[in-house]
Amino acid sequence: MKISEEEVRHVAKLSKLSFSESETTAFATTLSKIVDMVELLNEVDTEGVAITTTMADKKNVMRQDVAEEGTDRALLFKNVPEKENHFIKVPAILYDGGDA
């Protein structure tokens, strides 16, 4: 399956990435090869092969859900540079807006 350069540009725009023309061409070629290799898996005869979802023998290894004493809030906030309404205030890393 051929991945076009236009598809690469479209996904790059949605991902807020920018590539040069040579990078776009290289990505289109590489992604096309990857998709072709994955499509080869459809040709494998799996008749009679049991469904396998994991190779690990362990299933849902979890600890007991036990309530524990938390850290004293005053002690926790002692070294916090900025707080607001009993919450630790941190710099914003996500902004509202954009094309995605």
Swiss-Prot record:
Gene Ontology MF: a single term: glutaminyl-tRNA synthase (glutamine-hydrolyzing) activity
EC number annotated for this UniProt entry: 6.3.5.-
GO-annotated biological processes: glutaminyl-tRNAGln biosynthesis via transamidation; regulation of translational fidelity; translation
InterPro entries documented for this protein: Asp/Glu-ADT_sf_sub_c, GatC
This protein's UniProt keywords: ATP-binding, Ligase, Nucleotide-binding, Protein biosynthesis
Reactions it catalyzes: L-glutamyl-tRNA(Gln) + L-glutamine + ATP + H2O = L-glutaminyl-tRNA(Gln) + L-glutamate + ADP + phosphate + H(+); L-aspartyl-tRNA(Asn) + L-glutamine + ATP + H2O = L-asparaginyl-tRNA(Asn) + L-glutamate + ADP + phosphate + 2 H(+)
Record text on subunit structure and interactions: Heterotrimer of A, B and C subunits.
Protein role: Allows the formation of correctly charged Asn-tRNA(Asn) or Gln-tRNA(Gln) through the transamidation of misacylated Asp-tRNA(Asn) or Glu-tRNA(Gln) in organisms which lack either or both of asparaginyl-tRNA or glutaminyl-tRNA synthetases. The reaction takes place in the presence of glutamine and ATP through an activated phospho-Asp-tRNA(Asn) or phospho-Glu-tRNA(Gln).
Family note: Belongs to the GatC family.
Record NCBIfam families: gatC
Name of the protein: Aspartyl/glutamyl-tRNA(Asn/Gln) amidotransferase subunit C
Gene source species: Streptococcus pyogenes serotype M18 (strain MGAS8232)
Lineage summary: Bacteria, Bacillati, Bacillota, Bacilli, Lactobacillales
